UniProtKB/Swiss-Prot annotation:
GO terms for biological process: photosynthetic electron transport in photosystem II; response to herbicide. This is Photosystem II protein D1. GO terms for cellular component: chloroplast thylakoid membrane; photosystem II. It comes from Bigelowiella natans. A quinone binds at residues 215, 264-265.
Length: 344
């Protein structure tokens, strides 16, 4: 048998570029989604940093009452934010070239829309990049599926909610105090605390924290010691070792006796799927709740639903929450309303 070896022809520049982009040997995987992710996230990050430091006040309500958000205009890390695009712009696409000047663009909050749009494309591309790398390594796609939960949450507050309310000025400000303001106003207008999807999200986040702490503490408490008493147990682990690093039987037995037998997983794969699925599904529900409340399908209203035999109202906690909602509602954007309550 004769083997014929031919010298490989020099590949084109484009072919070498494609090979480099999709190579899993790079220190950081780029991928085709990364080609879109890198410039969009760099743009969003750069504009955010510059805007947080130096952006002038923004006329968020469209009534010529600008709100300051940057450090150079009197804010600190906690009170500072990228102020949302003006209500005068609404949902219009507002790039720099649509404004008469850069000053007008800044006054109307153009940077917020620029950051949010690039950030949205960037995080979606990051999710796609996770799937792409998993595919090339022969892994299952669940990492990208799990990441879809925070992507859905960000999409809900930055994209879906402004669309439903008719203006980017209703989007979540990009700052700490601005986020709190968004939460308070959202409760006032939509009664989110009484929405079952938000309740499921709370169960997902708090439950996920509890399960993570339980799992971590159980594993840490049942490590198989490979070191002396005078050395850290952690030093007994060798990266890539084939044998188990902890005794799952001991952990299962402990937890089964602490609660009851069937509360403890005896399958490591089922356990880790549960740890991933619980918070992800909870955050999915919260994102769906925000997206439905965006179109004013609000939380439950049990106001004045309990009355005595004489027809007098017996207040429940729902009525107390409603009273708080009314107070928050009439106090926010107090110069923008012609009526005590939004007609929506």
């Amino acid at each position: 048998m004769t083997a014929i070896i031919e010298r490989r022809e020099n590949s084109s520049l484009w072919a070498r570029f494609c090979e480099w982009i999709t190579s899993t040997e790079n220190r950081l995987y780029i991928g085709w989604f990364g080609v879109l992710m890198v410039p969009t996230l760099l743009t969003a990050t750069t504009v955010f940093i510059i805007g947080f430091i130096a952006a002038p006040p923004v006329d968020i309500d469209g009534i010529r009452e600008p709100v300051s958000g940057s450090l150079l205009y009197g804010n600190n890390i906690i009170s500072g934010a990228i102020v949302p695009t003006s209500n005068a712009i609404g949902l219009h696409f507002y790039p720099i070239w649509e404004a008469a000047s850069v000053d007008e663009w800044l006054y109307n909050g153009g940077p917020y829309q620029m950051i949010v749009c690039h950030f949205f494309i960037g995080v979606c591309s990051y999710m796609g990049r996770e799937w792409e790398l998993s595919f090339r390594l022969g892994m299952r796609p669940w990492i990208a599926v799990a990441y879809s939960a925070p992507v859905a949450a960000a999409t809900a507050v930055f994209i879906i909610y402004p669309i439903g309310q008719g203006s980017f000025s209703d989007g979540m400000p990009l700052g700490i105090s601005g986020t709190f303001n968004f939460m308070i106003v959202f409760q006032a207008e939509h009664n989110i605390l009484m929405h079952p999807f938000h309740m499921l999200g709370v169960a997902g986040v708090f439950g996920g924290s509890l399960f993570s702490a339980m799992h971590g503490s159980l594993v840490t408490s049942s490590l198989i010691r490979q070191t002396t008493e005078n050395e850290s147990t952690n030093n007994g682990y060798v990266f890539g070792q084939e044998e188990e690093t902890y005794n799952i039987v001991a952990a299962h037995g402990y937890f089964g006796r602490l609660i009851f037998q069937y509360a403890s997983f005896n399958n490591s794969r089922s356990l880790h799927f549960f740890l991933a699925a619980w918070p992800v599904i909870g955050i999915w529900f919260t994102a769906m709740g925000i997206s439905t409340m965006a179109f004013n399908l609000n939380g439950f209203n049990f106001n004045q639903s309990i009355i005595d035999s004489q027809g007098r109202v017996i207040n429940s906690w729902a009525d107390i929450i409603n009273r708080a909602n009314l107070g928050m509602e009439v106090m926010h954007e107090r110069n923008a309303h012609n009526f005590p309550l939004d007609l929506a």
